């Protein structure tokens, strides 16, 4: 009986355990293509990294407050190779709270990094013409609110008899740390081109 109880407990544990699935692209990563795309050119991509706080439905409001990337935030630039396209499509299709899509360690090495300044600005210089993917994680302090009953008011009739009570609520605001992934594809068509973007 004891063995059955232990076995049943283990089975229930596996059923309710939140499994984390991990996927990797199955396309061959050609480091020669990636290295060639990241070799020196005369083009520049510069921009500003910012984000907006998501609402209760997980959507960033159009007219919401912008939170600029803090100084020192890393912005990564990846060359868009066939391997990267496969990675991006898999991430778009499969990634959620239980599933993560990763690049191989070797593919992740082929990128250029830039740091943001005090106003969230960044710059990538000496790029060749080609298609690139830029990504950053913008950390910010978000705000939320909740209501709490802080008292009540009693109502009496004209003769002084008690009729009913109504709660009095007060709204409290608090801040919490949040982060959003911001990304964009950028294509440089001519050598010497300057692209200005907003992430």
What is the role of each PLM region?
Residues 20-95, 143-199:
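Primarily secretory-pathway and cell-envelope proteins
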Residues 1-21:
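Bacterial Sec-dependent N-terminal signal peptides
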Residues 83-89, 98-119:
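Short, acidic Ser/Thr/Gly-rich low-complexity loop/linker segments typical of extracellular
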Residues 127-136:
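A short tyrosine-centered beta-strand micro-motif
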Residues 139-140:
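Short, charged beta-turn/beta-strand-edge "cap" motif at the junction between a beta-strand
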Residues 119-126:
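Short, surface-exposed beta-strand/beta-hairpin micro-motifs centered on an aromatic residue
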């Amino acid at each position: 009986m004891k063995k059955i109880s232990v076995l049943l407990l283990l089975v229930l544990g596996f059923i309710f355990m939140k499994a984390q699935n991990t996927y990797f692209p199955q396309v061959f990563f050609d480091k020669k293509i990636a290295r060639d795309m990241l070799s020196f050119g005369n083009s520049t991509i510069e921009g500003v990294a910012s984000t907006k706080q998501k609402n209760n439905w997980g959507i960033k409001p159009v007219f919401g407050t912008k939170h600029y990337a803090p100084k020192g935030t890393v912005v990564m630039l990846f060359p868009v190779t066939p391997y990267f396209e496969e990675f991006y499509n898999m991430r778009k299709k499969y990634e959620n709270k239980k599933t993560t899509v990763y690049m191989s360690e070797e593919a992740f090495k082929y990128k250029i990094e830039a740091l943001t300044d005090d106003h969230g600005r960044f710059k990538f210089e000496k790029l060749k013409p080609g298609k690139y993917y830029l990504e950053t994680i913008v950390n910010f302090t978000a705000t939320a609110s909740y209501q709490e009953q802080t008292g009540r008011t009693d109502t009496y009739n004209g003769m002084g008899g008690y009729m009913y009570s109504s709660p009095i609520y007060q709204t409290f605001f608090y801040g919490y740390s949040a982060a959003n992934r911001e990304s964009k594809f950028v294509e440089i068509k001519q050598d010497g081109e300057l692209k200005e973007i907003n992430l």
